[in-house]
Amino acid sequence: MYQDLIRNELNEAAETLANFLKDDANIHAIQRAAVLLADSFKAGGKVLSCGNGGSHCDAMHFAEELTGRYRENRPGYPAIAISDVSHISCVGNDFGFNDIFSRYVEAVGCEGDVLLGISTSGNSANVIKAIAAAREKGMKVITLTGKDGGKMADTADIEIRVPHFGYADRIQEIHIKVIHILIQLIEKEMVK
C-alpha cells in the first residue's frame, strides 16, 4: 500500500547523504569541529547548544550524548543544551522569543567555550542572536545549517551545511548523523 512512498523517502534520504558526501569540505569541517570541541574541553571549556523544534531536540541529544555516553562508557564531557523550560518561558515572556538563547549564553558562556547553533534554514533569529552573544564572550561558534546557510552563513568559525532545498527533515537527518560522528571523534580526541 505504501511501499512506493517508503522507497521514495529512503531514496531521497540516501541521495541527500550522497550529495553531502560529495563535498570533501564537509568531511574536513566535521573533523575541525570535533577537534575544536575536544580542545575546548581539554582547556576547561564547555559547549552550549541550541536550536528550535527538531533542531532543539538535536541540540539536547548532542549534549546528552556528551554528558552521558555514546557507544562506550567514559567520563562525561561538559555540554549544556539551552533547554531549561523555566529559562525559556521567563526570557520569552519578559524579553521575547528571539532572546531565549542569547540570554543564556550571556549568563553562562565564557571565553574558550563553544556554541553549537543548529538551524535547518540558517535563519533562526534566536540562534543568530546567540551567535552574536557568543562572539561577545570570546566563544568559538560551530553551526549546523541547511539550504544556502541563510543569515547564519559565514557567521561561524566552522559551518557544516547540508545543501538540501526540500523539506527540513532531510537536513535534520544529516545533522543527527553529523552529531553522532562529532561525538565519536571527540571521544577519540579526548584520549590522545
Curated annotation (Swiss-Prot):
Pathways involved: Carbohydrate biosynthesis; D-glycero-D-manno-heptose 7-phosphate biosynthesis; D-glycero-alpha-D-manno-heptose 7-phosphate and D-glycero-beta-D-manno-heptose 7-phosphate from sedoheptulose 7-phosphate: step 1/1
Residue stretches making up the SIS domain: 37-192
Keyword terms of this UniProt record: Carbohydrate metabolism, Cytoplasm, Isomerase, Metal-binding, Zinc
Taxonomic superkingdom: Bacteria
GO MF terms held by the record: carbohydrate derivative binding; D-sedoheptulose 7-phosphate isomerase activity; zinc ion binding
Cofactor binding note of this UniProt entry: Binds 1 zinc ion per subunit.
Annotated compartments: Cytoplasm
Cofactors that this protein relies on: Zn(2+)
Segment forming the signal sequence: none
Residues annotated as binding Zn(2+): 61, 65, 172, 180
Annotated InterPro entries: GmhA/DiaA, Phosphoheptose_Isoase, SIS_dom, SIS_dom_sf, SIS_GmhA/DiaA_subfam
EC number assigned by the record: 5.3.1.28
GO cellular component entries: cytoplasm
Binding site for substrate: 52-54, 65, 93-94, 119-121, 124, 172
Alphabetical GO biological process terms: carbohydrate metabolic process; D-glycero-D-manno-heptose 7-phosphate biosynthetic process
Electron transport found in the keyword field: no
Keyword Metal-binding recorded: yes
Alphabetized Gene3D superfamilies for the sequence: Glucose-6-phosphate isomerase like protein, domain 1
Physiological role: Catalyzes the isomerization of sedoheptulose 7-phosphate in D-glycero-D-manno-heptose 7-phosphate.
Family assignment from sequence similarity: Belongs to the SIS family. GmhA subfamily.
Anything else known: The reaction produces a racemic mixture of D-glycero-alpha-D-manno-heptose 7-phosphate and D-glycero-beta-D-manno-heptose 7-phosphate.
Protein name: Phosphoheptose isomerase
High-level lineage: Bacteria, Pseudomonadati, Pseudomonadota, Gammaproteobacteria, Enterobacterales
Gene: gmhA
